[in-house]
């Protein structure tokens, strides 16, 4: 029987087939999202067992960019320096090139300096960092393993599971020994990818487009890509030919590892019959020595799950949103899921989370997933809509004119949204949210390429430096934090008492008026994930009601409207 068709596990089966283990959270999937969740839970003192059918090695990295927001999480976990020092050359140019091939005709480039001298945002203490999955995953794995709360079990496959009401029972098999074991957990979280078996077993459907285009990645080693043309060195070279965009070459490690991506492969594409060497030669525009290390066929998708949970089982990462890699939102969106769910699971397990706190996970994260999935598709549509210019590679005047025309098209500021997207990275907000107190102020525009810091409830609490090397966001994480921006300390005994009664962790921090203009209120309550829950000039009359709402304890469920994913072929943006 298939994994989906197998009967639900009974306690009797579990006892017969192997040993039983108990934990608070069972995590299925050991990619970056599953590992991030294990770290987030461990950081909060929650015990977890992570199972993954693979060996934990990353032969073919799918991601190589860690966003500023993910770096902020890494900062809280204590590993941001390790990510920065993982190995990416600090003097490597942050450059995007558009050309007929790596060594062919170039018609446009974006230069943004290097990791050490590029223009940095004032909106965050951390910044985007190139760190391929071959470095990032092992870094997360080792950090997770150091936590006494965490158990990582590779070569271990979830065979079946059952939500029995008070807990989840998962039967797993050790693929090396063939032995079965039962893991009992208060909750289970599936971080098992776009083809999530757990999502299928739960019967949760997806909305969107399952096949925007068929793609292939060719991974290769080459130390001579830019030999003799160092001025062309780039993190990515978009390949544009007579029929438009046909692929891109990107650096994986800033040295000798590369990925060639090719788009719009035929539906019957067979990677085994594919001439990868010819494709690499065409992309490089020169016959240089290189070694193919892998070929990976994949489908570009635009999907969001209709539900993010069922009972005691939750879904994170690609299991609930599959998006085009353009813009680098995939893994980073998944890690945001893990952080949002992580503090809510911890609150529930520690006894202070209300009945509706875990339901707010889907209500907050699904709109962000729809937003990011659609933006990734839109950005890819923008690039793929570059016109087909037949003479683009010609050496005559017609070719020169065609390349000039393409260069003029690429001057459109919208093409920068692929890598200039701080609004997407930092500007996502939980508005509306049942556990954030709404206010009548006008929300800031939700731009892609620019970001205006705001402390409006639901938003990420703004960054500001308190002292050398210490950001205001370094105050957030363990529990709720009440920021007091008044000249003299405000009396907030009612809120402190209410939080103590409900066993909600709360710290009051007197900042003073220096950053009140940024937060636009005298008092601001920040959640454990660093998002604003409430703000005001004084405490509300009923402090207990405020505490109950932000911990998800209401008289009845609060309905939240969730947008639908754009369920159609991607928009073709006219830029001609």
For each of these PLM feature ranges, what is it?
Residues 154-168:
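A conserved short coil-to-beta-strand element within the FAD-binding core of flavoproteins
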Residues 59-143:
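Active-site-adjacent segment of FAD-dependent monooxygenases/related oxidoreductases
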Residues 29-39, 45, 140, 190, ...:
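Conserved mid-domain beta->alpha element of the FAD-binding
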Residues 21-23, 177-187:
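Core beta-strand elements of the Rossmann-like FAD/NAD(P) dinucleotide-binding domain
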Residues 42-63:
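Glycine-rich FAD pyrophosphate-binding loop
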Residues 2-5, 346-459, 465, 470, ...:
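C-terminal helical "tail/cap" subdomain of flavin- and related membrane-associated enzymes
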Residues 81, 142, 169, 187-300:
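Conserved FAD-binding catalytic core of PHBH/FMO-like flavoproteins
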Residues 1-25, 40-44:
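Extreme N-terminal leader/targeting segments of oxidoreductases
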């Amino acid at each position: 029987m298939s994994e989906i068709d197998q009967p639900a596990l009974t306690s009797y089966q579990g006892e017969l087939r192997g040993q039983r283990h108990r934990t608070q959270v069972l995590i299925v999937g050991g990619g970056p999202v599953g590992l991030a969740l294990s770290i987030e839970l461990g950081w909060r003192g929650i015990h977890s067992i992570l199972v993954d059918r693979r060996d934990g090695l990353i032969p073919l990295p799918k991601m190589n960019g860690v966003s500023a927001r993910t770096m902020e999480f890494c900062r809280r976990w204590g590993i941001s320096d390790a990510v920065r020092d993982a190995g990416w050359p600090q003097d490597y140019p942050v450059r995007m090139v558009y050309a007929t091939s790596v060594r062919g005709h170039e018609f446009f480039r974006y230069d943004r300096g290097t990791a050490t001298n590029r223009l940095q945002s004032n909106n965050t203490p951390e910044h985007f960092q190139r760190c391929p999955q071959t470095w990032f995953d092992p870094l997360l794995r080792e950090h997770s393993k150091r936590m006494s709360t965490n158990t990582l079990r590779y070569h271990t496959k979830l065979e079946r599971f059952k939500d029995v009401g008070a807990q989840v029972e998962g039967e797993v098999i050790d693929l090396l020994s063939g032995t079965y074991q039962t893991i009992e957990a208060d909750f289970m979280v599936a971080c098992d990818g776009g083809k999530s078996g757990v999502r299928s077993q739960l019967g949760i459907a997806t909305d969107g487009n399952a096949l925007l285009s068929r793609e292939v990645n060719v991974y290769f080693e080459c130390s001579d890509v830019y030999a003799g043309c160092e001025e062309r060195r780039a993190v990515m070279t978009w390949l544009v030919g007579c029929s438009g965009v046909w692929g891109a070459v990107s650096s994986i490690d800033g040295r000798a590892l590369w990925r060639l991506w090719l788009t719009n492969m035929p539906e019957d594409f067979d990677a085994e019959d594919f001439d990868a060497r010819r494709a690499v030669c065409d992309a490089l525009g020169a016959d240089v020595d290189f070694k193919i290390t892998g070929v990976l066929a994949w489908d570009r998708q635009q999907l969001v799950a209709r539900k993010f949970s069922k009972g005691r089982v939750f879904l994170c990462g690609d299991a609930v949103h599959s998006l085009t890699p353009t813009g680098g939102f995939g893994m980073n969106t998944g890690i945001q899921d893990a952080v949002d769910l992580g503090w809510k699971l911890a609150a529930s397990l520690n006894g202070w989370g209300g009945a509706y706190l875990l339901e707010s996970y889907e209500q907050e994260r699904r709109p962000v997933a729809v937003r990011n999935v659609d933006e990734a598709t839109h950005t890819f549509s923008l690039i793929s809509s570059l016109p087909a210019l037949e003479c683009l590679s010609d050496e005559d005047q017609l070719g020169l004119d065609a390349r000039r025309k393409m260069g003029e098209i690429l001057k459109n500021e919208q093409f920068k949204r692929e890598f200039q997207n701080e609004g997407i990275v930092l500007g996502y907000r939980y508005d509306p949210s049942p556990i954030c107190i709404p206010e009548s102020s006008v929300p800031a525009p939700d731009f892609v390429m620019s970001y205006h810091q705001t402390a409006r409830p639901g938003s990420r609490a703004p960054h500001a430096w308190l002292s050398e090397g210490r950001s205001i966001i370094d105050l957030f994480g363990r529990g709720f934090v009440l920021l007091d921006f008044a000249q003299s300390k405000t009396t907030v005994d009612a809120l402190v008492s209410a939080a103590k009664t409900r066993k909600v962790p709360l710290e009051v921090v007197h900042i003073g008026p220096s950053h009140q203009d940024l937060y636009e209120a005298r008092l601001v309550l920040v959640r454990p994930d660093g998002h604003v829950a409430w703000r005001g000039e004084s405490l509300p009359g009923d402090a207990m009601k405020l505490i109950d709402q932000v911990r998800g304890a209401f008289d009845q469920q609060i309905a939240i409207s969730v947008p639908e994913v754009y369920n159609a072929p991607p928009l073709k943006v006219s830029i001609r």
